[in-house]
Amino acid sequence: IMPKCTHMGGAEFLEKNLADNENLEMWDGELYLEMHRGTFTTKSDMKRANRRLENKFRNAEMLSVLRGEDNRDKITSLYKKLLINQFHDILPGSHIHPVYEDAMADYKEIEAELDKIIGTGSKYFNTLNFKRDALTFVPNKKGTSTRYGEKGNWLIPDIPALSSASLRKTYVNGEWIEIDETVETPYYSVKFNGDGSIASLYDKELGREWADGDFNKLKIYTDCPGNYDAWDILPNYKDKQIDITVSKPLSLFEKDSECASFLTELKTEKSTWTMIIRLFRRSRGIEVENIVDWNEKHKLAKAEFGCNVLTRKALCDTSAGFIERDTHKNTSWQQARFETCHHKWCDLAETDGGVA
């Protein structure tokens, strides 16, 4: 006996069988696919370009409105090109190489057009809806600091929300940092290892130690996930770790009235790794810049940060806010989430402080 069959499209089928269906279970929270975890970082240039452009679109729209310019058609056209490249096989990196080349060409074109809309000028504009008073690197060919190979100065803009201002470097007399076996800054007492990892990060204001175990420790593992080479990371990836040697121990590289940079050089059998660590006079932030000549295959690089923070939750930045994730592995579901993603920051905090 043949069952009764009716030909219909997907939309009609879903509407007929799923709409107002009270027997369907509801899922509340983050959807997590227990495979293809490598796509969080595969083709990272694309992910970085996509996120940068998302922010530039906001700036272009805002400045167009404030100037009374009608750029809606142009911005809409550029948005569509960006959204095409957010297709699920493009942005994750699970594609063939020509797709990568096409996407990066699109990103370059979109950014050039957005830069025309945003424009240039002699003043800096704060696009945030609150005062920008965090220490910021401002490019300047005559600057006294170097970041990502570019000269500039570290300044506190102090620009109100949605306002513009000129920025000028201020000079401070006197030493703000003591460099010995322990590095003393206004905020921290820091003990470095030769490979750039931090043996101790003592907070002077709060009177507590933040480092617990390996902190800013570079680790490289053998990465042979099987069928999906560039897309998967196996749960046992830590089983085989690759030796890293220090070719140049950490030492002071550059210093001015706002920032002190320390440099170390590391190497494996085939690759070299330059790590620059920055400490600041007017910021609790510690910045790490990595310059890598990567010639490895089937290897996975990570930086480990063992934090002296007791919390069951981590707050992770996403494209539209943040998400709260568990930090423990009590259940099989939590154990499966050994690899998660976030954008600019991840925050581990107690009531009186934390590490982000």
What residue ranges belong to the model's regions?
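Active-site and substrate-binding clefts of carbohydrate-active enzymes
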Residues: I1-G119, F125-T127, I156-P160, R168-Y171, ...
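Solvent-exposed beta-hairpin/edge-strand motifs
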Residues: P139-G149, V309-A320
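Catalytic and substrate-binding regions of extracellular carbohydrate-active enzymes
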Residues: R72-T76, I84-E304, T327-S332
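Short, well-ordered alpha-helical packing segments
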Residues: E287-I291, K302-C307, S319-A320, H342-C346
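Short secondary-structure boundary/capping segments
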Residues: I1, D20-N23, P139-N140, E304-L310
